[in-house]
Curated annotation (Swiss-Prot):
Catalytic activity: 2 a quinone + NADH + H(+) = 2 a 1,4-benzosemiquinone + NAD(+); N,N-dimethyl-1,4-phenylenediamine + anthranilate + 2 NAD(+) = 2-(4-dimethylaminophenyl)diazenylbenzoate + 2 NADH + 2 H(+)
Species for this entry: Trichormus variabilis (strain ATCC 29413 / PCC 7937) (Anabaena variabilis)
GO molecular function, one term: FMN binding
PANTHER family: FMN-DEPENDENT NADH-AZOREDUCTASE 1, FMN-DEPENDENT NADH:QUINONE OXIDOREDUCTASE
Keyword Oxidoreductase: yes
Protein name according to UniProt: FMN-dependent NADH:quinone oxidoreductase 1
Entry keyword Ion transport: no
Pfam family, any one: Flavodoxin_2
Gene name in the database record: azoR1
Origin organism lineage: Bacteria, Bacillati, Cyanobacteriota, Cyanophyceae, Nostocales
Annotated binding of FMN, by residue: 9, 15-17, 139-142
Subunit structure: Homodimer.
Required co-factors: FMN
Enzyme Commission code(s) on record: 1.6.5.-, 1.7.1.17
Textual note on the cofactor: Binds 1 FMN per subunit.
Keywords: Flavoprotein, FMN, NAD, Oxidoreductase, Plasmid
Length: 207
């Protein structure tokens, strides 16, 4: 069993979402010393946006892929291989303009791919990533959970569900830009929520 850990904030050591995802990983590894962790830093090392060559390759019948088209999918293949190899996902995603950072949107575009993470049949679309768990930790300047301006959680739930991931947990650290007291309360609340998710995953995951 493997854990896939993604950060998408470009803020480096100042990032709250990074510190929160790291807390989860540290707690998880304390209980599962031998569980490998795949780490990808989308904030510092963003994946490229998909382009015309990528689209042509992704929808080309596999038997007709040329070396050039195969090359266009190399990064996508690598990212999807990481997804398939892991059973548990921890994603740190700050809210930017009521949604996700561009780095995470580019990541989603690379991994949502026909015949790899979903298939199309006479019955419609079917996601291929079964029996996975994902924890999404978001950081937000204000309070948006359940509000019309929250285009982040509904979007991510829809995308993850489309590729087959339905066991999705969100922890929202909100009001981080309101004031120091609100900020500290939000971080402390997120720490408690992370500890609870670790306990829940521990009780429901066979290692």
């Amino acid at each position: 069993m493997k854990l896939l850990h993604l950060d998408s904030s470009p803020r480096g050591e100042r990032s709250i979402s990074r510190s929160l995802t790291q807390q989860f990983v540290s707690l998880w590894k304390q209980m599962h010393l031998d569980v490998p962790v795949i780490y990808r830093d989308l904030g510092r090392y963003p994946v490229p946006a998909i382009d015309e060559a990528w689209i042509a390759a992704a929808f080309c019948p596999p038997a007709q892929l040329t070396p050039e088209l195969q090359s266009a999918l190399m990064i996508s293949d690598e990212l999807i291989a990481e997804l398939l190899a892991a059973n548990l996902y921890i994603f740190g995603i700050p809210m930017y303009n009521y949604s996700v950072p561009a780095s995470f949107k580019a990541y989603i575009d690379q991994i949502v791919r026909v015949r790899r993470t979903f298939v199309v049949s006479a019955d419609g679309y079917e996601g291929l990533l079964k029996d996975k768990k994902v924890l999404v930790i978001t950081t937000r300047g204000g309070s948006y959970a359940g509000e019309p301006l929250d285009f982040q959680e509904p979007y991510l739930r829809a995308v993850f569900g489309f590729i087959g991931i339905t066991d999705v947990t969100f922890i929202h650290a909100e009001n981080l830009a309101i004031g120091s007291e609100e900020r500290q309360l939000a971080i402390a609340t997120a720490h408690e929520a992370i500890q609870q998710v670790v306990k829940t995953w521990q009780s429901s995951t066979c290692i």
